[in-house]
């Protein structure tokens, strides 16, 4: 199946041309494309939000300028105070965490020492049990030998 297409362009607004394309044998509908016009077709397109922000330079002696500067100075002051407060809060939190860490390390040392003492007691008790079982076993063996001879 061969594809045959034709293009024709119509001049648009603001230096933008619309290209219309007709496609044969495909059955698909083509969407017009917007492309910049050729040389001499106008300047850059400016977004509406940018157009409204253009203003003449302000006079430094005007009330509006002074009010804007005052608001800006207050905002900067507020931002710096907020930043200082955040730094102080962070430093305070760091100190709290250091203290907590020291307490936890001391607790670990104490619990490790307690574990060591309990292990020693357990091993000593286990040794004593083993010695008692062995001595009872030896006595029974000796007593059995004496009873067998009688």
UniProtKB/Swiss-Prot annotation:
Extract the GO molecular function terms from the UniProt entry: DNA binding; DNA-binding transcription activator activity, RNA polymerase II-specific; DNA-binding transcription factor activity, RNA polymerase II-specific; DNA-binding transcription factor binding; identical protein binding; RNA polymerase II cis-regulatory region sequence-specific DNA binding; sequence-specific DNA binding; sequence-specific double-stranded DNA binding
Give the matching PROSITE patterns. BZIP
Annotated bZIP domain residues: 62-125
Basic motif as annotated region, ranges: 66-93
Subcellular localization, as worded in the UniProt entry: Nucleus
UniProt KW keywords: Activator, DNA-binding, Isopeptide bond, Nucleus, Transcription, Transcription regulation, Ubl conjugation
Where are the residues of the annotated region Leucine-zipper? 97-118
Cited Pfam families: bZIP_2
Task: Cite the residue spans of the region called Disordered.
Answer: 27-94
Keyword Transcription regulation assigned? yes
- Point to the regions of Basic and acidic residues compositional bias: 56-72
Broad class of where this protein is predominantly found: nucleus
**Gene Ontology CC annotations of this record:** chromatin; nucleoplasm; nucleus; RNA polymerase II transcription regulator complex
* Entries under SUPFAM superfamilies matching the protein: Leucine zipper domain (SSF57959)
- An annotated GO BP: positive regulation of transcription by RNA polymerase II
Q: How does it assemble?
A: Binds DNA as a dimer and can form stable heterodimers with CEBPA and CEBPB. Interacts with ZNF638; this interaction increases transcriptional activation.
| Homology family | Belongs to the bZIP family. C/EBP subfamily.
According to its UniProt entry, what is the function of this protein?
Transcription factor that binds to the promoter and the enhancer regions of target genes. Binds to the enhancer element PRE-I (positive regulatory element-I) of the IL-4 gene. Binds to the promoter and the enhancer of the immunoglobulin heavy chain. Binds to GPE1, a cis-acting element in the G-CSF gene promoter.
Q: What is this protein called?
A: CCAAT/enhancer-binding protein gamma
């Amino acid at each position: 199946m061969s594809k045959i297409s034709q293009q024709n362009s119509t001049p648009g607004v603001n230096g933008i041309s619309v290209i219309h394309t007709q496609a044969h044998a495909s059955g698909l509908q083509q969407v017009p494309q917007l492309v910049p016009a050729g040389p001499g077709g106008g300047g850059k397109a400016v977004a509406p939000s940018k157009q409204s922000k253009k203003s003449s330079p302000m006079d430094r002696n005007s009330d509006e300028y002074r009010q804007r500067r005052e608001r800006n100075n207050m905002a900067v002051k507020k931002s710096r105070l907020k930043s200082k407060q955040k730094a102080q809060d962070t430093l305070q939190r760091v100190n709290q965490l250091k203290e907590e860490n020291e307490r936890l390390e001391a607790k670990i040392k104490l619990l490790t020492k307690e574990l060591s003492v309990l292990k020693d007691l357990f091993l000593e008790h286990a040794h004593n049990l083993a010695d008692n079982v062995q001595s009872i076993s030896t006595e029974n063996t000796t007593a059995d030998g004496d009873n067998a001879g009688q």
